[in-house]
Amino acid sequence: IWSGIQGAF
């Protein structure tokens, strides 16, 4: 799951 630009799973 991409969280904004951070790309946190």
UniProtKB/Swiss-Prot annotation:
Disulfide bond positions: none
Subcellular location: Secreted
Major site of localization recorded for this protein: secreted
One cellular component (GO) term of this entry: extracellular region
Keyword Cytoplasm on entry: no
Tissue: Expressed by the venom gland.
This protein's UniProt keywords: Secreted
Protein name per the record: Venom peptide 1
